[in-house]
Amino acid sequence: MHTVEKIGGTSMSRFEEVLDNIFIGRREGAALYQRIFVVSAYSGMTNLLLEHKKTGEPGVYQRFADAQSEGAWREALEGVRQRMLAKNAELFSSEYELHAANQFINSRIDDASECMHSLQKLCAYGHFQLSEHLMKVREMLASLGEAHSAFNSVLALKQRGVNARLADLTGWQQEAPLPFEEMISSHFAGFDFSRELVVATGYTHCAEGLMNTFDRGYSEITFAQIAAATGAREAIIHKEFHLSSADPNLVGADKVVTIGRTNYDVADQLSNLGMEAIHPRAAKTLRRAGVELRIKNAFEPEHGGTLISQDYKSEKPCVEIIAGRKDVFGIEVFDQDMLGDIGYDMEISKLLKQLKLYVVNKDSDANSITYYASGSRKLINRAARLIEEQYPAAEVTVHNLAIVSAIGSDLKVKGILAKTVAALAEAGISIQAIHQSIRQVEMQCVVNEEDYDAAIAALHRALIEPENHGDVIAAA
């Protein structure tokens, strides 16, 4: 049986190493096949095509959406073209491959440019609104980056004697989009995995519109659906690092250990903290299909990485990972009139959802509720103002916080709460709130934002390092 493997954009930018470590490595003959690869755009390309993920700096899409002038988005699109052509020149030294790579991406960019120009012209008439078509434009632009890296991968593999074949899921010039699952199954029906190494685009054009729901998380959704639809033996995500017991930059590279084995429940907890091993919807697809997920370091191919399965539970209770997130605001709502009235929580939760604020956790007592939410300061302040307007008697306070968590497939460790509190106290860190559910999979400590780094190091030192796990907590 085959595997389905995903390679992220940062790894794809180190393409020669990816060829040597993942695509080919020491494999020969039949060992090269029975694999499907789902590849992302090269690092930075999607930022240029849409907008910068972290800074918000406008790319082609954002300039087009602002519609100030056609020149602005055209200039940005030409800038992307030059970056893509430069990447081609970096990858291919032979004239044939370079010409093929350039011809492919030039054709796609020309088509996109013509389409956007025509749409802008059409929307100059009052009967047509540009805003109604923007999501389609966003998806079309995103697909350029995915198609670029996938086409180049096939070209490079063929150059090295591998029978590689492109699965172009971008729907380019397709008459009408198919439903997502049908789009995947129809594309993969004709492949012979025993003789063909398949490279698929991370973006799938479909009737539902993946970006409507997942925005830039679409590649993992595509990856998971391919694994489920084709009955993969295993799904593998190649990252630039191991799934480790903590961030090595915070606790020291010599202190962290690879997790080795865990379950989808732990992956969900990590996702809730914004430290995604895999998108929760993708995990759900794999889990339902009974496909196990392996997280590997792209640049350590011989290492087994970490295997995530549905039923795994550590042999003895232990903490597997210390993780957290910094960008958390505590919205504290105090109102003595809320005693016994569940309507407060329902209405405020609805308001936060409308503002698209992500609630990591919440706690309450007799007359107060605190929501630990992630989002921009501007939106958080707006939420606080709207809550005050809705409940004039309430006192609403916003706190700058961080959440630090101890997570494990079986966290029923005797005295873990006492150890945690003692470790943070010894590090001079004040706990603002603490959460531990009956299921004993995660324990969250809420601390002041400036204490985040020290709290991660303190908990790793107290809860993981004394166990002397060696290189891996549980071998995959």
UniProtKB/Swiss-Prot annotation:
Pfam families according to UniProt: AA_kinase (PF00696), ACT_9 (PF22468)
Compartments where located: Cytoplasm
Every ACT domain range: 405-476
E.C. no: 2.7.2.4
Organism of origin: Stutzerimonas stutzeri (strain A1501) (Pseudomonas stutzeri)
Top EC class of this enzyme: transferase
Keyword hit for Cell membrane: no
Catalytic activity as recorded in UniProt: L-aspartate + ATP = 4-phospho-L-aspartate + ADP
Induction: Induced in response to osmotic stress.
Keyword Kinase: yes
Function: Involved in the biosynthesis of L-aspartate-beta-semialdehyde, which is an intermediate in the biosynthesis of ectoine, a highly soluble organic osmolyte, called compatible solute. Ectoine is used to avoid excessive water efflux, plasmolysis, molecular crowding of the cytoplasm, and cessation of growth in high salinity environments. Catalyzes the phosphorylation of the beta-carboxyl group of L-aspartate to yield 4-phospho-L-aspartate.
Protein name: Aspartate kinase Ask_Ect
Disulfide topology: none
